[in-house]
Amino acid sequence: MADTLLKCTTRHVRLFTARVDNDDLVPSANELTLDLDPDNEFIWSESCISQVQQRFKQLVDAAAGGELSDYTLRRIGTDLEGFIRQLLQRGELSYNPEARVQNFSMGLPRTPELL
């Protein structure tokens, strides 16, 4: 499997069975790479990034020992999408007003006027 690159792509999460080497993805059966919010739809604090990385580690650890498949990657990616939505709903994460597109893919911003 070392030559096969598996990937999962959701709106805000991209997962690869690879490591980054000189800005290139090198397939790896033993490593997962997380690309978070590639379209910069959100404004990320260090705390939010850390929380997503922690959740990613928990999900990877929980899947350890099992088959590394497209399905496993999709489950991890989908769970991370849900976690990002929770951060947004709690007000810990916010939409980036400078983003290329304002589509509010995870719901309208939670502001006092809208609550």
From Swiss-Prot:
Main location: membrane
EC number: 7.1.1.-
The family this protein is said to belong to: Belongs to the complex I NdhM subunit family.
GO CC, any one term: plasma membrane-derived thylakoid membrane
Role played: NDH-1 shuttles electrons from an unknown electron donor, via FMN and iron-sulfur (Fe-S) centers, to quinones in the respiratory and/or the photosynthetic chain. The immediate electron acceptor for the enzyme in this species is believed to be plastoquinone. Couples the redox reaction to proton translocation, and thus conserves the redox energy in a proton gradient. Cyanobacterial NDH-1 also plays a role in inorganic carbon-concentration.
GO molecular-function terms, A-Z: oxidoreductase activity, acting on NAD(P)H, quinone or similar compound as acceptor; quinone binding
Membrane topology according to the record: Peripheral membrane protein
InterPro entries noted in UniProt: NdhM
Keyword Translocase: yes
Name by which UniProt lists this protein: NAD(P)H-quinone oxidoreductase subunit M
Keywords, comma-separated and alphabetical: Membrane, NAD, NADP, Plastoquinone, Quinone, Thylakoid, Translocase, Transport
Localisation: Cellular thylakoid membrane
Reactions mediated catalytically: a plastoquinone + NADH + (n+1) H(+)(in) = a plastoquinol + NAD(+) + n H(+)(out); a plastoquinone + NADPH + (n+1) H(+)(in) = a plastoquinol + NADP(+) + n H(+)(out)
Pfam families the record matches: NdhM
Quaternary organization: NDH-1 can be composed of about 15 different subunits; different subcomplexes with different compositions have been identified which probably have different functions.
